[in-house]
Amino acid sequence: MHRIPGPIRVVLTGGIACGKTVVSDDFRALGTEVVDTDIISRELSKPGSPMLEAIAKALGAGALSEDGSLNRRAVREMAFHDKGKLGILNAITHPAIMEEAMRQAFAARGHYVIMAVPLYFEGGAGGYADRVLVADCAPEVQLARLMARDGSSEATARAMIASQASRDTRLAGADDIIDTGSLSFDEIRTAVLNLHQKYQTL
């Protein structure tokens, strides 16, 4: 397969509450451009947008908050409990989000660009990554972080984790790994700096 042109694309992914934001923020601090699909998703689903209208039509009025914005918690609950709705949601959002992500990646000026794609493996691990960086942590650390962050019960947190690709799948598909569970913030920063220097030579 021919490589898609443009800067080197490093996909940053990882399980929920595994420290992807900390890692991406450290890359940003080094001047690296970061294309974040979560941010793109929020931009594309603003009130009045075609994507938001399509989501509301497919999932019903419960997908919207009183102010007309996307009710992310409600949509997450719908998708979590109904695989059919999850498939519909992904069919509406994924192509548009990835089209914009690739547009931003092509426009990046550095030697490499970080593409933060939380559900990279769940989305079929499309052939746009030159390298895959996984933010990882031990399952017990992930569970504790998720419960603390979202105020979730243990059962809900475990179910959310189980709905994603397995840790083994992510690690098997990784070219590089940063263990955010065992490293301090300073050590994570150092690990990012080392990878930054490595990626500059690819």
Predicted ranges, named:
Residues 112-119:
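Switch II (G3) loop of P-loop NTPases
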Residues 1-4, 103, 108-112, 126-135, ...:
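NTP-dependent small-molecule kinase module
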Residues 122-124:
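Charged, compositionally biased, marginally structured helical/coil segments
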Residues 19, 38, 89, 114, ...:
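Residue-level signal for inorganic ion chemistry
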Residues 39-111:
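ATP-dependent small-molecule kinase phosphotransfer cores
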Residues 15, 58, 78, 92, ...:
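Amphipathic alpha-helical segments that mediate coupling or scaffolding at interfaces
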Residues 1-70, 190-193, 197-202:
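Glycine-rich phosphate-binding loop of ATP-dependent small-molecule kinases
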